[in-house]
Amino acid sequence: MIDQFGRLDVLVNNAGLMLLGPIVGADVEEWERMLSINVQGLLYTTNAALPHLLKAAEDDPRQVADIVNISSIAGRVAWANYGVYNLTKFGVNGFTESLRQEVTKRRVRVGVLEPGGVATELGTHNSGAMREHIDAFVESTEILEAQDIADGIAFMVTRPRRASIAELWVMPTDQA
């Protein structure tokens, strides 16, 4: 990407996996998959992008760069049967805040976007009672569309250089 376009101005960490179920008797391989994608993927991608973002923040035309980490309202509120997913999203929020404090004075803005229910494949990775729970929520709620999240990201990264959006909730009106 850098070779093709010459610079990196924005990183959006959006990969995620949500495998729900009770902690007691859980399949720990599912935990490892969620930790690998939701936490380690974000860490490794951020680590690789940071030198390029710091350089872009020093240069014209923007003189600012952005990292937007996609978390979840599950990073703010814990629910039964969401334990490890909650863990990963609370971790994303904590990492985002720490990184924000480290690099914002160097003009790399770091923010977290925490969506509520969105029409994605995220819930389809579940089965049984958890899938029924997710399907019931989707049927009873006018959930967000991907464009709603894209609009939130665009809002965060297009503020003037002097303004940094550290946290943005985007919720379905029915869920708020």
Could you describe each region identified by the protein language model?
Residues 112-113, 120, 131-176:
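C-terminal helical subdomain
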Residues 72:
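Residue(s) in the substrate-gating loop at a strand-loop-helix junction
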Residues 51, 101-104:
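Alpha-helical segment proximal to the catalytic Tyr-Lys
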Residues 1-6:
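Conserved amphipathic alpha-helix within the SDR
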Residues 22-23, 30-32:
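Substrate-binding pocket helix/loop in short-chain dehydrogenase/reductase
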Residues 24, 77-83, 141:
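Active-site loop immediately N-terminal to the catalytic Tyr-X3-Lys motif
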Residues 46, 88:
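Active-site helix of classical SDR
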